[in-house]
From Swiss-Prot:
Species per Swiss-Prot/TrEMBL record: Rhodospirillum centenum (strain ATCC 51521 / SW)
PROSITE patterns in the cross-refs: MRAY_1, MRAY_2
Transmembrane segments: 21-41, 72-92, 94-114, 135-155, 169-189, 200-220, 240-260, 263-283, 289-309, 338-358
Protein name stated in the entry: Phospho-N-acetylmuramoyl-pentapeptide-transferase
Example of a GO MF term: phospho-N-acetylmuramoyl-pentapeptide-transferase activity
Any Pfam family matching the protein: Glycos_transf_4
InterPro entries (UniProt xref): Glycosyl_transferase_4 (IPR000715), PNAcMuramoyl-5peptid_Trfase (IPR003524), PNAcMuramoyl-5peptid_Trfase_CS (IPR018480)
Family per similarity comment: Belongs to the glycosyltransferase 4 family. MraY subfamily.
Length: 361
């Protein structure tokens, strides 16, 4: 909004020329989202405590150390959503369609997560919305986003799949691109949701992935940098760096309240929306496969659950002591902070590996 209001006045007031730089607006979005999180955080937490009473239900079959978390409010993802949406709308070019597509996924998935959290609290169990209903709604929203993306993106980028390490390879998926994009967005959303099981565990890898894709968005949206790196140039996607900056800032603000011992949990409101947002940004920038590397920690968590379920159904035996895999390490005797910090390190390493794909071609 500031870009649309102030940049046209740059001829009269030279300082407003700053708003044409995506890097400046990305920094502004980050700081704004951080400040919003700090300001509204205590108020949101007080409100959540007043309406939730006993807080998020704690799994009785989980690690015993988690029982002390009883009474901690959930749905803290609300403060992330508010900070991201307000900051993005304030600093982004409102004429940029890719930003609106990503916001559609972010808000849509956030509403689904909110409904899930609400039912968990009112029914006093850990189930919430049925898995089928959540899946159906997330698929529908992701399908709309994918179709919208195809409609506004020039061919062959619209239905093309870029492959890391190959500079000119763009596989045309045709209409199969829609189910593929749905898989990326819904898969990322659920993978992040599964990762959100310990204090601070999910939000830092989310910030790392957001910062990484903010850089990727900036580079892919810039014809000169894209040409130098020999990655596919998608005009307009540079504005997504502003969104990613807002996500990093909001994440930092949320971490202030989510650091061990957490004052509030993210809940599905935050995890579903943030995961969906990362998936959507990867689709817009043609780096869907790179997301599997950068977000490898999320992939690991999701795969551990699938392996555990498949193994138990087929053999009656469990591969891990408990799934997702972060609980496996807790059961092995690792303290919660040890698991969290080591997983943060893994996320940072994977982000560097993902960034290396931009140059290794």
């Amino acid at each position: 909004m500031l870009f649309n209001l102030l940049y046209p006045l740059a001829d009269e007031f030279q300082i407003f020329n700053l708003f044409r730089y995506i890097t400046f607006r990305t920094g502004g979005a980050m700081v704004t989202a951080l400040l919003i999180s700090f300001v509204i955080g205590p108020r949101v937490i007080r409100w959540l405590k007043s309406v939730q009473g006993e807080g998020q239900p704690i799994r009785t079959d989980g690690p015993e150390t988690h029982l002390k978390k009883k009474g901690t409010p959930t749905m803290g993802g609300l403060m992330i959503l508010i900070a991201v949406i307000v900051s993005t709308l304030l600093w982004v070019d409102l004429a940029n369609v890719y930003t609106w597509i990503v916001l559609l996924v972010t808000v849509g998935f956030g509403l689904i997560g909110f409904g899930d959290d609400f039912l968990k609290l009112t029914k006093r169990n850990t189930k919430g919305l049925s898995g089928r209903l959540k899946l159906a709604w997330t698929i529908a929203i992701a399908g709309v986003a994918a179709t919208w993306y195809i409609a506004v993106t020039p061919h062959p980028l619209d239905t093309g799949l870029a492959v890391p390490f190959f500079k000119d390879l763009l596989v045309n998926l045709g209409w199969f691109f829609i189910p593929f994009a749905i898989l990326v967005m819904v898969g990322a959303s659920n993978a992040v949701n599964l990762t959100d099981g310990l204090d601070g565990l999910a939000i830092v890898p989310i910030m790392i992935a957001a910062a990484t894709f903010g850089l990727i968005a900036y580079l892919s949206g810039n014809a000169i940098f894209a040409g130098y790196l020999q990655i596919h140039h998608v005009p307009g996607t540079g504005e997504l760096a502003v969104f990613c900056g807002a996500l990093v800032g909001a994440g930092l603000g949320f971490l202030w309240f989510n650091a061990p011992p957490a004052m509030v949990f993210m809940g599905d409101t935050g995890s579903l929306s943030m995961g969906g947002a990362l998936g959507a940004v990867s689709v817009m920038t043609k780096h869907e496969l790179v997301l599997a590397i950068v977000g490898g920690l999320f992939v690991l968590e999701a795969v551990s659950v699938m392996v555990q379920v498949a193994s138990f159904k087929l053999t009656g035996k469990r591969v891990f002591r408990m799934a997702p895999i972060h609980h496996h390490f807790e059961k092995k005797g690792w303290s919660e902070p040890t698991v969290v910090i080591r997983f943060w390190i893994i996320a940072a390493i994977l982000a560097l590996v993902g960034l290396s794909t931009l140059k290794l071609r």
